């Protein structure tokens, strides 16, 4: 247990740049990526066509087109996803792209309404 406490203490003393470098090194060492949970969710949704006969309970909210009011759409994407400005801008400019995946029908409809209110074209899949 003393080893774990020392590791926690060592990690707590890292600067932000050192922590980012550690993260990259661990991703390379373990062969994983910070984006892995999104990929897993997408793979899980694609692996379930047999359940398509039942009513869908999880939806992917896909930004089809940002429309003319990109700034408003970027603001909404940031509010919905918690992404930073650059990440939200890249998502909006790279449309069509999923904004949120595997969400309940009610939440998906709410997100769709928010984005459409900002001027975007949105699809639920």
Swiss-Prot record:
Q: Please provide the Gene Ontology terms (biological process) for this protein.
A: translation
Q: Which CDD domains match?
A: Ribosomal_L7_L12 (cd00387)
**Record keyword NAD present:** no
What's any one GO cellular component for it? cytosolic large ribosomal subunit
Which terms are listed as keywords in the entry?
Answer: Ribonucleoprotein, Ribosomal protein
Q: Which GO terms describe its molecular function?
A: mRNA binding; structural constituent of ribosome
Which Pfam families does this chain map to? Ribosomal_L12, Ribosomal_L12_N
What highest taxon heads this organism's lineage?
Answer: Bacteria
Q: Does the keyword Ribosomal protein apply?
A: yes
Family membership noted in the UniProt record: Belongs to the bacterial ribosomal protein bL12 family.
Q: How does it assemble?
A: Homodimer. Part of the ribosomal stalk of the 50S ribosomal subunit. Forms a multimeric L10(L12)X complex, where L10 forms an elongated spine to which 2 to 4 L12 dimers bind in a sequential fashion. Binds GTP-bound translation factors.
This molecule's function is given as: Forms part of the ribosomal stalk which helps the ribosome interact with GTP-bound translation factors. Is thus essential for accurate translation.
User: Which protein are we looking at?
Assistant: Large ribosomal subunit protein bL12
- The species is Chelativorans sp. (strain BNC1)
Q: Which gene encodes it?
A: rplL
């Amino acid at each position: 247990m003393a080893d774990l406490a020392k590791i926690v203490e060592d990690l707590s003393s890292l600067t932000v740049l050192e922590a980012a470098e550690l993260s990259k090194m661990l991703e390379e060492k373990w062969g994983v990526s910070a984006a892995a949970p999104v990929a897993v969710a997408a793979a899980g949704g694609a692996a379930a066509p047999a359940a398509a006969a039942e009513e869908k309970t999880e939806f992917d909210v896909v930004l089809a087109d940002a429309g003319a009011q990109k700034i408003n759409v970027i603001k909404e994407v940031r509010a919905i996803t918690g992404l930073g400005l650059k990440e939200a801008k890249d998502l909006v400019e790279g449309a069509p792209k999923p904004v949120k995946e595997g969400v309940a029908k009610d939440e998906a409809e709410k997100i769709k309404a928010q984005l459409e209110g900002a001027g975007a074209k949105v699809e639920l899949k």
